[in-house]
Amino acid sequence: MKNLFTILCIVLLVSCSSDNGSDIDTAPSGYPADLEGTIYYKWATDGILKVSLPSATGGSFIQDDTKLNSFDVSRDGKYRLTATNASTLGNYVVKFTLSNMNNGSIVKEFNYTSPAGNSYCKGQLSPDNSLILVTSNDEEDGITILKTDGEFVIRLEGLNNVPFSMHDLAMWLPGNELLLTHGNSIIRVPPPYNSGSLVKEMNYADWGDLTVNHQGTQLAVRIDNHVYTMGIDSNNMRQVTTSNFKESKPVYSPDSKYLMIGSNYRQSSVMGYSWDMKIIPNDGNTYNVDPVEANSPGVLPVIWKGQDRIVIGSGDVIWK
């Protein structure tokens, strides 16, 4: 196990229901031809759903998510990775399953027990499909990298002897590099994962929901109630959403031409939050995505083909 030690400085509007959306927005006459990929998202008790673009064809992806910790889809669209709670009395196991997207056959599968015995670990598949990034809400678990057959690679326990907290984030960059948050710091960590470089100190009272585009060139992050983008080196920060409410959950399209935004982000249950799915061009302009007022030209509410209600999400979301 290794401890990273070098830092190189260089509002409640709509309550949650079983419906797949709210009727605030109307479907556009058609989505742009260059709006590509599939958005996978959790919604209430309906499991993991998907909507493919530009056709806006919707459907189920994972029907039963009662024991599902996380899901991911490879960037080439060939594989699905799931992490499920497979624990039994006294045996706190997470099962990782890599399966074929075309026929559902299992490619690799293994059980994992974290140092803290946490059965709610999550996994992300590396860009080259060779590694799994394992995160946990227990600081004793740190951040772990495994091969897709379960072989241990490395565990990062913290930075400068300060462990990672449950609020810190970790994600892949191209070349199997890591992008991490540690407190208010955003950090890049290249293989072999024993040192890192500071991207930016986020000196804001409220920020989160950091994400990176597939190309590893741009970041999106929520600051206070709105979404901002910036270059991977933290330059050219721009506010890209506005409204009288809150936006969150930004996700880049595979080609980085668009951003999915969780607009009207609100608490919908004692422990849960939900949001309306809208898409904006990733051109550095600021778009009004308000749930009540008229939206800026170019804002696209996501509505399944044949339906008339905007898609609502309530958990993890990816665009592949």
Regions found by a protein language model. Give the residues of each.
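Sec-dependent signal peptide recognition
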Residues: 2-9
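C-terminal motif of bacterial Sec signal peptides marking the signal peptidase cleavage site
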Residues: 12-15
